[in-house]
Amino acid sequence: MTLFQSELTYPATATACAIVGSVFDVKSRRVPNVVTLPAFLIGLLLHLALGGWRQMLSALAAGAICGLVFLVFYLAGGMGAGDVKLIMAVGCIAGMSHLFYILAWTAIAGGVMAVGLALVRGKLQETLMNVGELFSHHRHNGLQPHPDLNISNARTLRLPYALAIAGGCILTLYFQVA
């Protein structure tokens, strides 16, 4: 396998796993362990097979970094644990060389999705005010979830964030090929 092929292998595999997670998230609003654990193991084994122990450990670190970034949002009540586990698996598969791009494109995709959902539901102004409220709340209360503006409240706008993760992977893959 050439370097070019192996470099595409990682984001392509991460994209495939993120798409599978997205299907579950859209249908059930959950990303089950039956998706995330095998994806995580695929990432470790893929890096071990193509790059050896050092690359596998680097992939493990990439998964941990992604997980820590998303853990902040989980602890603040902004996303579910399945999303955290999925981004950990995706980070492990993609590895350090794609880590920043996947996180950045995922954030952009998630922001676009959130604004789009707020527009479609006619709640853009309310959503923007809620974002201000969340910033204020977390500035004073740390990561403690807001009493009303969290994913446990059925009245809040919620979106299947695995779609944003898949979007981030697709965009990373696209720009890797382009």
Language-model segment annotations:
Residues 1-178:
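A membrane-topology feature that recognizes alpha-helical transmembrane segments
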